[in-house]
């Protein structure tokens, strides 16, 4: 009986420890060891408290706000500004009259003369574009 009480008093050795079993199962399945670590109390005391941290964030949010409302005129200038115009580099001279014209386009002065000529001489159904 004394042997039984000694065995009952001594801590029983577990054959199955669930925490170590699942940790080894996790490392076998994913190949990544389980991250179980304790943070020392000294490190926790060095961290700033949450209210002071929130105050710092709130101060940054308040400073990010414009001081005055954007005026109607400034909004319109910004919206209606449009994009910068590109320089026209493909210009050449018209072979008939010698005025400047865009490449692969009809000369505006020659086109006006052609339209006037067609209007004076019977106005056929042909149109010059």
Curated annotation (Swiss-Prot):
Pfam families per UniProt: Ribosomal_L32p (PF01783)
Q: What family does the database annotate?
A: Belongs to the bacterial ribosomal protein bL32 family.
Q: Could you give a GO molecular-function term held by this entry?
A: metal ion binding
Binding sites annotated in the UniProt record for Zn(2+): 94, 97, 107, 110
Record-level GO BP terms: translation
InterPro entries from the UniProt entry: Mitoribosomal_protein_bL32, Ribosomal_bL32, Ribosomal_zn-bd
In chain numbering, the transit peptide falls at 1-63
Q: Which PANTHER family match?
A: 39S RIBOSOMAL PROTEIN L32, MITOCHONDRIAL, LARGE RIBOSOMAL SUBUNIT PROTEIN BL32M
User: This protein's superkingdom?
Assistant: Eukaryota
Q: Which protein is depicted?
A: Large ribosomal subunit protein bL32m
Subcellular location field: Mitochondrion
Give the chief site where it resides: mitochondrion
- Give an example GO cellular component term for this record: mitochondrial large ribosomal subunit
Function as written in the Swiss-Prot or TrEMBL entry:
Component of the mitochondrial ribosome (mitoribosome), a dedicated translation machinery responsible for the synthesis of mitochondrial genome-encoded proteins, including at least some of the essential transmembrane subunits of the mitochondrial respiratory chain. The mitoribosomes are attached to the mitochondrial inner membrane and translation products are cotranslationally integrated into the membrane.
Modification after translation, per record: MRPL32 precursor is processed by the m-AAA protease (composed of YTA12/RCA1 and YTA10/AFG3), which cleaves the N-terminal transit peptide. Cleavage by the m-AAA protease takes place prior to assembly into the large subunit, an essential step for mitochondrial ribosome (mitoribosome) assembly. Proper processing by the m-AAA protease is dependent on the zinc-binding region within the tightly folded C-terminal domain of MRPL32: zinc-dependent folding halts degradation initiated from the N-terminus and triggers the release of mature MRPL32.
Complexes and interactors: Component of the mitochondrial large ribosomal subunit (mt-LSU). Mature N.crassa 74S mitochondrial ribosomes consist of a small (37S) and a large (54S) subunit. The 37S small subunit contains a 16S ribosomal RNA (16S mt-rRNA) and 32 different proteins. The 54S large subunit contains a 23S rRNA (23S mt-rRNA) and 42 different proteins. bL32m has a zinc binding site.
Sorted keywords for this record are: Metal-binding, Mitochondrion, Ribonucleoprotein, Ribosomal protein, Transit peptide, Zinc
Could you tell me which species this protein originates from? Neurospora crassa (strain ATCC 24698 / 74-OR23-1A / CBS 708.71 / DSM 1257 / FGSC 987)
